[in-house]
């Protein structure tokens, strides 16, 4: 499949999701969220793989194969979590961080912590909040049947990932990825 086909499919899925959100959303917050975070914990956007390895204690390294990721176990918002760090395939720059909590009951706590950092979601549905920034950065908070996941993606680096023909992330070990839930991929 060539990159134009992949781009067309991703664009179609994004539009479909956003149209679905628009039909079910609460009124959108007028103000753009505060500045997009520079990273999560000790990892900052654009860091090289070896820099993240040096800053974060990881338990799994899949940076030589898709989805080009490092995995760590740590506390986020004083809750145990699995943190997945995703890198662009060629330049190996950090462009996305997923934080997964293995307890759907912590959704309110995580949402409350994020609310202290952000002005509010652009789209809101039951168990899903989406914040967008002008540079196409995005934060998605999602409650899944067995987990809660927060996905932070840097807009400029998402673009770089696409330019480097990076694959969309299909799964985040050890739980289903947020993108699979959003796009309802089996």
Q: How would you name each of these model-derived features?
A:
Residues 1-10:
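Bacterial N-terminal signal peptides that target proteins for export
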Residues 18-20:
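C-terminal motif of bacterial Sec signal peptides marking the signal peptidase cleavage site
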Residues 22-24:
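Bacterial signal peptide processing site
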Residues 26-64, 98-186:
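Non-cytosolic coordination micro-motifs
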Residues 54-82:
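N-terminal, post-signal-peptide region of Sec/Tat-exported proteins
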Residues 69-73, 84-85, 131-133, 141:
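Short beta-strand element of the conserved SAM-dependent methyltransferase core
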Residues 72-110:
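Mid-chain, structured segments of secreted extracytoplasmic proteins
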């Amino acid at each position: 499949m060539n990159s134009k086909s992949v781009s067309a499919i991703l664009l179609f899925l994004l539009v479909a999701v956003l149209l679905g959100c628009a039909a079910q959303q609460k009124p959108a917050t007028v103000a753009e969220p505060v500045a997009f975070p520079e990273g999560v914990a000790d990892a900052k956007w654009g860091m090289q793989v070896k820099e993240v390895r040096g800053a974060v204690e990881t338990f799994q390294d899949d940076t030589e194969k898709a989805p080009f990721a490092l995995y760590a176990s740590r506390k986020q918002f004083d809750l145990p979590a699995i943190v997945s760090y995703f890198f662009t395939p060629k330049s190996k720059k950090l462009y996305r961080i997923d934080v997964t909590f293995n307890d759907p009951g912590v959704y309110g706590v995580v949402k409350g912590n994020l609310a202290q950092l952000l002005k509010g979601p652009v789209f809101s549905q039951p168990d899903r909040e989406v914040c967008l920034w002008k540079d196409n950065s995005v934060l998605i908070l999602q409650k899944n049947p067995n987990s809660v996941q927060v996905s932070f993606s840097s807009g400029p680096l998402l673009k770089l990932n696409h330019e480097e023909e990076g694959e969309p992330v299909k799964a985040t070990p050890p739980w289903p990825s947020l993108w699979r839930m959003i796009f309802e991929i089996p």
